[in-house]
Amino acid sequence: MIRDINLTKRQKCVIDNTELEFLSRDSFPLFCGCVESDLKDDLICEQEWVVSKEGVIQLKNLIPLEILYANGHDAGTVGSLWEEHHREFANFIIKSDPKNVLEIGGGHGKLSQNCLSLADIKWTIVEPNSENKHKNVDYIDGFFHKEIFNNRCFDTVVHSHTFEHIYNPHEFLEEISSVLMGGG
């Protein structure tokens, strides 16, 4: 289904604000079979790849987040490689002895459950559409931005396979810093 979508168009490199050069353009199904709806009902979007002089490849046309993440798809939950990833990342996190963790984009809860099996931690997940909520985790339904925390602070902020989905990485990192105890 082709539908007009109000895309955000990058004019400069998201990392260093330099000019972008066209690489390629193609049409693609937005949800690519990651949801249960029929592929014929998928949204067809134009994917335009651009590159900066420094070699940073990025999408030029950005789908509005409320459309892109309207449904959860629990990526990163199936298979032994993902299970090992969450176990190893949990072991890494536990080494810093966290007490109050914010996980950004951890809708499936695998990382939280691995960490909570190892230590007593207050764990909060911010996720736009978490479907299977664990009772031992605090959930904030929405996209990450500092205003949703009402001045709450965390001693640790984690995210796994989330950064590549962030449209404004500088702003994202600044906002993470603002919710960390001591300002990061």
Each PLM stretch: what is its role?
Residues 170-184:
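A short glycine-rich, Lys/Arg-flanked "PGG" loop and its adjoining helix->strand segment in the class I
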Residues 146-152:
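Short conserved loop adjoining the S-adenosyl-L-methionine
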Residues 158:
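A conserved beta-strand element that flanks and buttresses the S-adenosyl-L-methionine
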Residues 43-48, 55-129, 136, 141:
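Extended interfacial segments that mediate partner engagement and assembly in macromolecular machines
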Residues 2-81:
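N-terminal juxtadomain amphipathic helix
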Residues 130-132, 172:
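Conserved short alpha-helix immediately C-terminal to the canonical SAM/SAH-binding motif I
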Residues 161-165:
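A short His-aromatic
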Residues 98, 154-155:
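Local beta-strand N-terminus motif with an aromatic residue
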